[in-house]
Amino acid sequence: MTENIHKHRILILDFGSQYTQLVARRVRELGVYCELWAWDVTEAQIRDFNPSGIILSGGPESTTEENSPRAPQYVFEAGVPVFGVCYGMQTMAMQLGGHVEASNEREFGYAQVEVVNDSALVRGIEDALTADGKPLLDVWMSHGDKVTAIPSDFITVASTESCPFAIMANEEKRFYGVQFHPEVTHTRQGMRMLERFVRDICQCEALWTPAKIIDDAVARIREQVGDDKVILGLSGGVDSSVTAMLLHRAIGKNLTCVFVDNGLLRLNEAEQVLDMFGDHFGLNIVHVPAEDRFLSALAGENDPEAKRKIIGRVFVEVFDEEALKLEDVKWLAQGTIYPDVIESAASATGKAHVIKSHHNVGGLPKEMKMGLVEPLKELFKDEVRKIGLELGLPYDMLYRHPFPGPGLGVRVLGEVKKEYCDLLRRVDAIFIEELRKADLYDKVSQAFTVFLPVRSVGVMGDGRKYDWVVSLRAVETIDFMTAHWAHLPYDFLGRVSNRIINEVNGISRVVYDISGKPPATIEWE
């Protein structure tokens, strides 16, 4: 009997902040399970979830607007601790008898708050002290409205010159509100405050650890599928790889992985996937060489969106054909992760998150009546990687840079040809190899190369030649929503360019992309 790792749980109500998923990841990092729900949940749903504590997230709207989101009143009647963050604090204050007004000045960025009264939330936590010994906290503010009067049964815990109620508390009911974002790294003691709330005030044990998550997932897979056979599309990416390892541990040879080699992968990637999962880990893998089929379907197509659709359609066709060859397969496994579930669909309000399955593989034939197995659907990407390490997958594979689903199909601009893919594979391998040698690979968030379908004149020996142009791309980002181009050293870029032009016959010019996002996107197509 495995331990109930969901026993202690935090409910996070989402009011639309860009940081809400980060709040959930921070709670998980503390070893405590949590779920992220829309703000307009019912009392019955909260009761069924039975949280140990509730966090009200930030949000972009104004509590002073008539139809702005409100926490369900039951949140304050459930008898569990409640932690309001930014907008969450404002709606808590307003709903419990306080007052909120639009501020004359929007506070955005770094601020220092002074702790003026004792509270369980921040006791013993400080970044500095005032001249008269009061604790100071370095925090990250992002708000337009502010609380101008707290509910009568609350106390002021901390303030700034422009924000009189930076932290408020009702210690008896264990209600806390902060007018800053403890989940971001700019709030230096933010993680300690979240830990104080989750572990001490809500009294949650750290049961949510990689080893225990694996034990729980294996037990749940076995309970769900029993002795049935399962099929999985294995791409070699993080999600499908960790899904494969979990299923293999749970059901062994009853798992069949279908690896479709579409000819759009990185250099030697197909061989590496087959060697690692087949030879090393002993998984049952069906290898489908399908390069010609994909490239012939892509012939003559220049439009990026059309290329994506073609690659997706052909993959589904190939996967379906292989699935039909297998006998008695009852289940389809997919590497759906928690952000997929959260973002999957919106309710009529446009705010609520509706949980539904992501069909990563696409539509299976109607005659195949299969159940769905999604062992990662409660996990964030960083948790999936940690579980992968625990399962024995190599660090370099789990933490390598993102690679698009359509692969080189969207890194070869315009029409995709085998010649172009072969050149780009070699170019990309040189760039990545040099980044690793220079200890730069882990310092950038994503690096890759792009094939440009233009010829440029070059000089080789005594002759001139017209060959292809490639672009190097490297970016630094926290969330991939915005990104800066990476300021790689000139001597490094020169070394990479020299190697590519000298070692890859067919390339005459190397350029470096210095576009940020926005206005550019990270990928070119």
Swiss-Prot record:
The keyword Metal-binding does not apply. It catalyses: XMP + L-glutamine + ATP + H2O = GMP + L-glutamate + AMP + diphosphate + 2 H(+). Residues 9-207 form the Glutamine amidotransferase type-1 domain. GO terms for molecular function: ATP binding; GMP synthase activity. InterPro entries: Class_I_gatase-like, GATASE, GMP_synth_C, GMP_synth_GATase, GMP_synthase, GMPS_ATP_PPase_dom, NAD/GMP_synthase, Rossmann-like_a/b/a_fold. One of its GO terms (cellular component) is cytosol. Residues 208-400 form the GMPS ATP-PPase domain. Pathway: Purine metabolism; GMP biosynthesis; GMP from XMP (L-Gln route): step 1/1. ATP binds at S235, G236, G237, V238, D239, S240, S241. Keywords: ATP-binding, Glutamine amidotransferase, GMP biosynthesis, Ligase, Nucleotide-binding, Purine biosynthesis. Its EC number is 6.3.5.2. PROSITE patterns: GATASE_TYPE_1, GMPS_ATP_PPASE. HAMAP family: GMP_synthase. This is GMP synthase [glutamine-hydrolyzing]. It comes from Shigella dysenteriae serotype 1 (strain Sd197).
